[in-house]
């Protein structure tokens, strides 16, 4: 199941946003979704196939798009973006 992998990605995004001192509500949103997805008993891939991602508490249009992108492509642009930014930060 991809649940744990996606939950970890959302948690890491929240960590980086927090390091960058970004909007607290946005950080909390990512943390909540990470926690909820990590606790899901349903397979998130099945939920995506059934167009039920937005049934997950805290998952709106943006988070659903990110999850769907990862399930389709194996990559999440937002995750890649924040990880690249934090890597660049620690290089200097």
PLM segments and residue spans:
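Long, highly charged, low-complexity intrinsically disordered interaction regions
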Residues: 1-92
């Amino acid at each position: 199941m991809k649940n744990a992998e996606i939950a970890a990605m959302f948690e890491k995004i929240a960590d980086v946003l927090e390091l960058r001192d970004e909007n607290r509500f946005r950080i909390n949103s990512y943390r909540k979704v990470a926690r909820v997805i990590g606790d899901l008993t349903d397979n998130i891939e099945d939920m995506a196939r059934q167009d039920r991602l937005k049934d997950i508490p805290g998952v709106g249009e943006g988070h659903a798009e990110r999850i769907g992108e990862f399930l389709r492509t194996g990559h999440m642009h937002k995750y890649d973006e924040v990880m690249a930014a934090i890597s660049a930060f620690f290089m200097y």
